[in-house]
């Protein structure tokens, strides 16, 4: 074993002997008791030295004018009548809640946390109100204005570029919501259209089946007339009439496609090759004029004299 290792082992033994000696001394003093292997120190006595505390407070206190501190020590403002009525109603409501419900444990009003929270908020409000009523006149005495002028222009903390980004973001959200609502409406319309088409198809199939059943009954002699066929014929004639009216309207007003420039002349129309319009046009005769040539003036005068 080297000399260094021997020195380390000797120092370890010495530290162990010292710790044992300290424990024995603590046991003799009564600091250690059976079952304890650590020295136990009793609680320190609390010292409330008011003089030193006030002196330390004055030492660290910043001597600034009241205008820089704005600290207030005041009493509570009087409770407004409407707030007193509201508090009373709230207490009555809580009492009725516990009275009419046997499942809830009864809580006295002074121990009710809900009422205590409400009262605490009222105390904060009254304290702030009293501070305002006392501080505003003091500020006026010091010549400090407490109201902004009507033409006051306050510079915004955010730049115009940032507000433009915010506006663009809000507009994008609004457009997205409008687009989403429009898509929902289209889906609902499609769904309703499919439902109506399905109902119409089912109704037609039911009518067809009913008519076939009546025909079978007529063939078997259970029905003596064919009145149901007259209703079908009337419906069919009505549908044909509506189809003819639709064709007439389409021929007169057109149906889809290009409308612009339809009344312009073409090569065939200007040459008089269009059906009805060219029938009245003849060479040397203006459109809309009579085909018979008018008599001359002298012949018209002679004709009048004969009468």
From Swiss-Prot:
Coiled-coil portions: 205-252
One Gene Ontology molecular-function label: RNA binding
Main location: nucleus
Key word Transmembrane helix present: no
Compositional bias (Basic and acidic residues): 236-245
Compositionally biased intervals (Basic residues): 246-266, 294-307
Swiss-Prot/TrEMBL keywords: Coiled coil, Nucleus, Ribosome biogenesis
Lineage top rank: taxon: Eukaryota
GO cellular component entries: nuclear periphery; nucleolus; preribosome, large subunit precursor
One of the GO BP terms on file: ribosomal large subunit biogenesis
Localization: Nucleus, Nucleolus
UniProt entry tagged with the keyword Coiled coil: yes
Protein family membership: Belongs to the EBP2 family.
Function as written in the Swiss-Prot or TrEMBL entry: Required for the processing of the 27S pre-rRNA.
Protein name: Probable rRNA-processing protein EBP2 homolog
Source organism (scientific name): Drosophila melanogaster (Fruit fly)
